[in-house]
Amino acid sequence: MKIPITQSKEWQTLQNDLKETSFFEKNEIYQYLAILKKTPVGNYLFLPYGPVADTREAIQQAIRSVTELAKKHNCIFIRIEPQLDDCAKYLDKIAKKVKDISPIDTWILDLTPDEATLISNFTQGTRTCYHNVPKRGLAVETTKDQDGIKHLISLQNQIFKKKHLTGYDENYLKTELAQPFATLYLVKYHHPDTNPTNPEEQTTDPIPEDGQVIAASLFFDHDDTRYYMQSASDQRYRKLPATVALLTSAIFDAKRKGIKQFDFWGIAPEGADQTHPWYGFTKFKKSFGGSPKHYAGTYDIILKPLKYRLFEKSKQLKKFLH
């Protein structure tokens, strides 16, 4: 079984540190991590990208197990997201398809080729940006220092404020970074030693201060996979290849550690046009080479229909009020 990080024992440790109640079950044919979610209407269990199994029959056994667990804790429903490719038809019979919580489509880069081959698989634009990183005064650092989270939060707030969104709080991100599987990458700008003398090379674009962090991201490592998680860059300096510097460093560092694949963690669905909110960063992620991966999505197994309807109504009301 290939275990996603969100169904691992390490992820349960993160949940414990976040003061969440969770339940871990593992045997020879399936594995799951179920997180107890509390609402004013009642509780439910959430299995992010779980349960995990290699066959539909094993998925069925895992669902029976988690159903008993849910009943024991008086849950209204169970929210599951199995990654098994051929289980969607089965899930349609026993569960309700709901809005996806975890990304249903992602982009996977195979890290087993040599670095030269990986670079050759970049698009021309990304390859040019990669080679220009040192010339543009960009340097990438890694840290486990929780003080570094302030940079990620500051950069995320720029984006979230513009889009009227709410990001993760500081404690959540610091708790993530405290886990052994997490590393924070920072891209800093340093003024180049020489300034362009040719008028054509000079620019009126805004320039960061020396030593300023202009991009940051958390990366998680589990088994043979590195995951690209919370990330942000300073939108004032878009013409600097900060995100290319960030990702290429993370990709090649992972390869040197012996990690086999890089999960970009979410892209727009196949065929999405420019109106899709993920269109831009999907095109960017694909520019590093790789291949798509599609999952079944999020399903609710309803145990208490009346309370489940109340749960849905309460969500609709909350959305309306906000």
Segments predicted by a language model, with ranges:
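A conserved beta-strand-loop-helix scaffold within acyl/acetyltransferase catalytic domains
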Residues: M1-V41, L84-C87, K93-S102, I108-L109, ...
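Active-site/acyl-donor-binding loops of N-acyltransferases
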Residues: P4, L14-D17, T21-S22, K38-T39, ...
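Short, high-confidence coil segments that cap the C-terminus of an alpha-helix
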Residues: E20, K72-C75, R256-I259
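Short catalytic/ligand-binding loop motif for oxyanion handling, primarily in non-cytosolic enzymes
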Residues: P40-Y44, R79, D86-K89, E270-A272
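Glycine-/proline-rich flexible loop or hinge segments
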Residues: G42-D54, C75-F77
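A cross-family glycoside hydrolase active-site/sugar-binding cleft signature
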Residues: P48-G50, E81, M229, W265
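Non-catalytic accessory segments adjacent to catalytic cores
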Residues: E57-D105
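Aromatic (often tryptophan-rich) hydrophobic motifs at membrane interfaces
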Residues: A62-V66, F181-N195, P199-K304
